Amino acid sequence: MQVILANPRGFCAGVDRAIDIVERALTLFGKPIYVRHEVVHNKFVVEDLRNKGAVFVEELDEVPDGATVIFSAHGVARSVVQEAERRGLRVFDATCPLVTKVHMEVDRHARRGEEVILIGHAGHPEVDGTLGQYDRSHGGEMYLVETVEDAERIQIRNPDALAYVTQTTLSVDDTLDIIETLKNRFPNIQGQKRDDICYATQNRQDAVKQLASECDLFLVVGSPNSSNSNRLREIAEKLGVEAYLVDNAGQIEDRWLEGKTRVGVTAGASAPELLVQEVVEHLRANGMNTVTEHGGTRENIVFSLPKALR
C-alpha cells in the first residue's frame, strides 16, 4: 500500500509572508498584536499564533486605541484602511501581493469610470476586500458574479467600458466558463493580466489532476473555511476519486482506508507541512508502508516583508 504526496502542496508565498508578519510583529512589539480576521484560513496556524499572543478580531472597533493591527492575507476594503488611519493605529498589511495587484486593477478601472465584474464567492473575505476597493465617485459600478447563470443575467451600463477581475483562490479552470460567457456577451470586456492570477492556486490544482488517476483515495489537508482546500477536494472527486478534507490526522476515519491501496495526499495553500507529515504517519500506522513524492512544478517565489518588520 502506497502514499503519494502531491507537489506542490501546502504553504504558498503569500501565506508564508502573512504568518511571518504576525510573528515578526510579536517579536518586535510584544503581545498583544491584533489581527483583523484569521490571517490565513487554517485552524492550526490561527491557534498557534493565538498562543503566541495574536488576538483575532473581525472589526477594528474591537481593537483598542494605540494598538498594532495586522490585516489578513485576504485583503481589506479601503474603508477599513481609512478607519485605521483615522484612529492612528499602527498597521501592518499582510495582504497577499497578488491580491494587492487585483486591488490596483480595480482602482485603475474605477478612476477611469469603467465598470468592473468580480468573479468570486460572495462572503469570502478576499471578495469583500476587493469589492471595497471600487470608488463609485467616478461614475462607474462594480458587480459580483459567482456562476455562469449570473454572467448570463448581469446587466451593465456600458459594455464598451467594462473589465473583469477574479478572486485569486480561483484558478483559470474555475473561471473559464464564466469568462467565456462574459466575453460572448461583452466582446470588448477587458481581462486581467495573466500574471495577476495566483500561481499557487493553479499549481496545486494541476498537481491533484496529475495525481488523481494513480489513486483510489485522496486526502486534502486544510480547514473547512479554506476556499482553495475545498476546491482541491472537489477536483479529485470530479475525477472519480473518493476524497476528503481533513484539518488533521485525527479526522481520518478508518472506513475511508478500507480496501484502498494508493492514497494521494495534498494540502491547501494555508496548511502547514507539519500537518501533512502527521497524516503520512497516520497512514503508515495503518499499513501504508511506501511514501513517494509525485513530481510537479517547483515554486521559488518569495514575497518580502514590510520594511518596518525586516
From Swiss-Prot:
Protein role: Catalyzes the conversion of 1-hydroxy-2-methyl-2-(E)-butenyl 4-diphosphate (HMBPP) into a mixture of isopentenyl diphosphate (IPP) and dimethylallyl diphosphate (DMAPP). Acts in the terminal step of the DOXP/MEP pathway for isoprenoid precursor biosynthesis.
Protein name: 4-hydroxy-3-methylbut-2-enyl diphosphate reductase
Record family assignment: Belongs to the IspH family.
Binding site for (2E)-4-hydroxy-3-methylbut-2-enyl diphosphate: H41, H74, H124, T168, S226, S227, N228, S270
Enzyme active site: E126 (proton donor)
Coiled-coil spans in chain: none
Binding site for isopentenyl diphosphate: H41, H74, H124, S226, S227, N228, S270
Co-factor note (free text): Binds 1 [4Fe-4S] cluster per subunit.
EC number(s) reported in the record: 1.17.7.4
One of the record's GO molecular function terms: 4-hydroxy-3-methylbut-2-enyl diphosphate reductase activity
